Amino acid sequence: MTIPDKQLAAVFHTHGGPENVKFEEVPVAEPGQDEVLVNIKYTGVCHTDLHALQGDWPLPAKMPLIGGHEGAGVVVKVGAGVTRLKIGDRVGVKWMNSSCGNCEYCMKAEETICPHIQLSGYTVDGTFQHYCIANATHATIIPESVPLEVAAPIMCAGITCYRALKESKVGPGEWICIPGAGGGLGHLAVQYAKAMAMRVVAIDTGDDKAELVKSFGAEVFLDFKKEADMIEAVKAATNGGAHGTLVLSTSPKSYEQAAGFARPGSTMVTVSMPAGAKLGADIFWLTVKMLKICGSHVGNRIDSIEALEYVSRGLVKPYYKVQPFSTLPDVYRLMHENKIAGRIVLDLSK
């Protein structure tokens, strides 16, 4: 395969809205030590990409930036020292691009909180380009049974909600409450939870999302635009409160309510990060009910392998729509307006 010197990429030079995204010709990078060059075939679009564009997180992003961190493609070149991967391997490029491998966190398989972590599409250029640099240690090998367009959303959305469900400590037959259940992460969380024998209370709005999450195994769907008292509705559905809550909604109000959904002794896992959102937990009831709050922003390398295994076995099926790469600005607009059910996957060939 001939690798070109230049390629098309979606670049933004300043923070702002979809109009700031420009399709430009940029150089194809050379893989360095322990790196590979991946020809990206498909990439998902995540809400984190919107935060990177808008610049509304306290973590600064590099500028100019090529966003994207749900890439699936083929290794076309390997850098010095790479033995794990070879040309032709099908791999995924994730939010976590690399970590140091030597700190106390990496040594405990907690590389997601490595102080030297590099993030695809945020601190380093990501997957909104035809050829992307990936760290050979962190690139995830995609099973042959999983199509690349299916694997793309798993690289962030799937891994993230799978790890968060593990953090919830919810056991078989117990209730997990998922605000934001109809979105890109949420519809996958419903499926992973079902595959892990949890019972699901899904919170979102709209008949299309209700139908979607019920088809994936949610026992209860609560529409936040129709329920007069969401906390009481969750308690009624679960006979006293959920054994765990997974907050995936991008609405700050979800965090104001989430502690109220909880059964005594349960765990609330914070995943989504709406700009400026605060946790609305009454300290008295947090203490008396012995509630636990756990942050979980992404999974590690073994979580990535396990998350793909569920897909390979047919237990999890991303709900997605493939669109041309050229439609990325429109996807940002729809995402900002909360009008996307499931995931949008971009075809880099179009």
UniProtKB/Swiss-Prot annotation:
EC number(s) reported in the record: 1.1.1.1
Pfam families tied to this protein: ADH_N, ADH_zinc_N
CDD domains attached to this UniProt entry: CAD3
Main location: cytoplasm
Subcellular location(s) per record: Cytoplasm
Phosphothreonine found at: 205, 250
Methyltransferase in keyword set: no
Keywords: Cytoplasm, Metal-binding, NAD, Oxidoreductase, Phosphoprotein, Zinc
Cofactor annotation remark: Binds 2 Zn(2+) ions per subunit.
Reactions catalysed according to its record: a primary alcohol + NAD(+) = an aldehyde + NADH + H(+); a secondary alcohol + NAD(+) = a ketone + NADH + H(+); ethanol + NAD(+) = acetaldehyde + NADH + H(+)
Highest taxon above the source species: Eukaryota
Positions with a binding annotation for Zn(2+) 1: 46, 69, 156
GO cellular component, one term: cytoplasm
Cofactor: Zn(2+)
GO MF term (any one): ethanol dehydrogenase (NAD+) activity
Protein residues bound to Zn(2+) 2: 100, 103, 106, 114
Function: Reduces acetaldehyde to ethanol during the fermentation of glucose.
Family listed: Belongs to the zinc-containing alcohol dehydrogenase family.
Subunit note: Homotetramer.
Protein name as annotated: Alcohol dehydrogenase
Organism name: Schizosaccharomyces pombe (strain 972 / ATCC 24843)
Lineage of the organism: Eukaryota, Fungi, Dikarya, Ascomycota, Taphrinomycotina
